[in-house]
Every structure is written in C-alpha cells, then in structure tokens.
Design a protein with these regions (language model features):
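Cleavable N-terminal export/targeting peptides
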Residues: 1-65
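Transmembrane beta-barrel domains of Gram-negative outer membranes and organellar outer membranes
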Residues: 59-270
C-alpha cells in the first residue's frame, strides 16, 4: 500500500501559442518550471509506450498511481502495467518514478502476482528498489458490492550493501454502495529496515472513486503510518478508450514541512 505523469502538436496556432507560452512559463519559478517540464515529458513518453503496447493487446481500463489499494484483483489471465512519475513542488531535486506490472494467472485465479521497479531521488541522492508483491482475494460478493483481499510485499534496495529494506502486509476492503461510487479502506503493518534502524508500524488508508462520466473518474485518498508518514492525494482519472487510464494528481504531506507534489501516471491492462 505504501510504496502506487503529451507533447504539443504542430498546427496553425503553433506560432501564436509559442509566442504566448514563453511568457507564461517564465512567470513560474525555475524549480516549478523544471518539475512541470519533467512531468509533461513523462506523460508523452508513457502514453507513447502505452499506445504501442495497446496496439497489440486486448485491454480494459483499470489501475492507477494511488497509494490506497482496493479489494479487487485482475481477472484470471489478465495483466496490467502501471507507470508513474512524481515531482516535489518546492524541491526540484526530489522526485520518484515507478514501473509496476501485475498478472493473475488462470492456474491461480485468486492470486495476483506483481513487482515494482522504483527509483527515488532526494536532494540529488538516488536509490533504486525492486518490490515483489502478491495479492490474494478472499471475498468477492458482487450482490453486496464487497471485495476483500490480503496483499504482501517486500522491498529490496539494488544499490546498497544491505539489500533488504522491509516488508508490508495490507488488507484492502472495497464497498460499492452505488454504481458510480467505490469506497476503499486499508489496514496493515509495515516493517522498515532502513540501514539498521528497524521500525514496525501500523498502516491505514481511506479513499473514494467517483465516476462522473464515461471518460472521467475523480479519486481522493488519505493514508498514513503510526508515528510516521501522513498524507493525502487527489485528482482526475481520464479513461482513454478501453485500453488506457491516465492519472493526474496532487498530493501533500501532513507532517514535517508539509511537502507538496504533482504526480502523473498511466495504466494499461491487457
């Protein structure tokens, strides 16, 4: 739970937009301008990659860049790939990115297997991790709108002498009281090794998904750890046909210096 951002096209208005956009961008501080440029580049690259894969895949919409999980898993024989990039608003040298595939195999229809490759950079110092994950659905009652699962994951640092960085246990519950509304509740436990400083903390999260239109869903969440991280995220999810979802979200920490960030992400399911 506690581990989940189009270039301009030339046309008749290109010269007009270029003349005005230069002045608009210059109004932004350099750090914000660089963060915005990185997010736009990532959106373009991600959508390009997803579009190529979508051409050879039979996909359905799902997935996202949020922390709070739901109680659903992929249908047997289906997979998804999530990619996201997050940049801090006031610290251009602090950013995170992740690529996370997951599949449910027909031979084990109640288990979703996945892994995430993530890169975090803080003040110029970076760390890369790989996170194997498994999620077992233990309850699915469509007539009641209830789904319940158990998810476990491990965190292994690839560029440290001591690779094991911790593990997570999370129990996500989803209730769908109305056709357009889904409510998510998470409860779990986290073990962080942190270079010898071992910590054990309870984790929690709440979230909602409200589908405003066929192509648009609004999502919000609040999550945290006992004595640790506390934050919220919210934003729209754009459904591009049957193949791709794109997330645009803002987030803010509720502790310390109350850092703010912008995240862009894309999901493909096939």
């Amino acid at each position: 739970m506690h581990k989940k951002y189009t270039p301009a096209r030339r046309d008749g208005f290109t010269k007009y937009r270029a003349r005005h956009s230069r002045h608009t961008l210059l109004l932004l501080p350099p750090a914000k301008r660089r963060a915005l440029q990185r997010n736009l580049i990532f959106i373009g690259m991600t959508l390009g990659l997803v579009f190529v894969v979508a051409l050879i895949s039979k996909a359905q919409a799902a997935g996202g860049a949020y922390v709070v999980d739901d109680g659903a898993i992929n249908a047997p024989g289906e997979c998804n790939v999530d990619a996201w990039y997050s940049a801090h608003r006031h610290a251009s040298s602090t950013h995170n990115s992740s690529l996370s595939p997951a599949c449910t195999f027909s031979a084990m229809p109640a288990v979703q297997w996945g892994a995430a490759l993530s890169r975090a950079v803080d003040a110029g110092k970076g760390e890369t991790q790989i996170n194997p994950q498994a999620k077992v659905q233990v309850l699915s009652r469509q007539e009641l709108g209830l789904e319940l699962a158990i998810a476990v994951g491990a965190h292994v640092a690839l560029d440290r002498h001591h690779g094991f960085d911790g593990a997570d246990l999370n129990i996500p519950l989803t209730w769908q009281p109305l056709a357009p509304l889904r409510l998510n509740l998470n409860a779990g436990w986290s073990h962080a090794y942190n270079d010898g400083d071992q910590q054990h903390r309870l984790t929690w999260g709440t979230g909602f998904e409200y589908q405003l239109a066929e192509k648009l869903t609004l999502i919000g969440e609040r999550y945290g750890q006992e004595g640790g991280e506390q934050a919220w995220q919210a934003g729209p999810r754009l459904h591009i046909g049957e193949f791709v979802d794109v997330d645009l979200l803002v987030g803010r920490s509720l502790i310390g210096d109350r850092a703010q960030w912008l995240t862009t992400g894309a999901t493909l399911r096939f």
